[in-house]
Design a protein with these regions (language model features):
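A short beta-loop-alpha structural element at the N-terminal edge
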Residues: 10-24
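Extended hydrophobic-aromatic, low-complexity segments
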Residues: 24, 35-37, 64-66, 74-79, ...
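A conserved mid-domain beta-alpha-beta active-site/ligand-binding segment of alpha/beta enzyme cores
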Residues: 28
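A conserved beta-strand-loop-helix scaffold within acyl/acetyltransferase catalytic domains
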Residues: 32-98
């Protein structure tokens, strides 16, 4: 895995820190209210330092994010991309990630993925997983391929009538 250059030179890409907590929560709430917002609140409430959240900033405004997992990320701070980590020597994970709707169509999605990949490579990961996505054509240009796929199975259970 090689370090790749970012397209956008007018934005700052960096790891979050505890001082970003309120801005990151507000950013998530404004763009993805619900689960992702709750995950950020829970992350900081569980002792997260911000290190697992990568930010793209336009001046001081968060305009994109990616959550990453490092081989040494605590179990209570990991995302789904890291559930396989015991099967790898030094697994890294990317996801979830997103770009503020006002900043889309500027290749920031590409850059936040590349930045996440670069950060994980610099942290000596052996492999990187992006879990639970259907966006295969988005991730393939960055060297990602399907490793596992899931099939959902269902069974209709007919309700039995009881006679009383």
């Amino acid at each position: 895995m090689d370090i790749e250059p970012l397209v956008n030179k007018d934005f700052v890409f960096r790891c979050a820190n505890v001082n970003d907590r309120l801005n990151l929560i507000e950013f998530m709430h404004n763009n993805w209210p619900g689960r992702w917002t709750k995950e950020v609140v829970d992350y900081f409430g569980s002792g997260g330092t911000g290190r697992e959240y990568l930010l793209c900033l336009d001046n001081d405004k968060i305009c994109a994010f990616a959550k990453v997992g490092y081989p040494n990320t605590s179990d209570n701070l990991i995302s789904y991309s890291m559930v396989w980590r015991n099967r790898f020597s030094a697994l890294g994970g990317i996801g979830p990630l997103g770009v503020d709707k006002e900043y889309r169509k500027r290749h920031l999605g590409r850059d936040i993925v590349i930045y996440g990949k670069n950060v994980l490579i610099e942290n000596k990961v052996s492999d990187i997983i992006i879990d639970w996505t259907g966006l295969l054509d988005f991730y393939r240009p960055y060297g990602f391929e399907v490793w596992k796929s899931y099939h959902y199975l269902t069974k209709l259970i007919k309700e039995k009538k009881h006679e009383f």
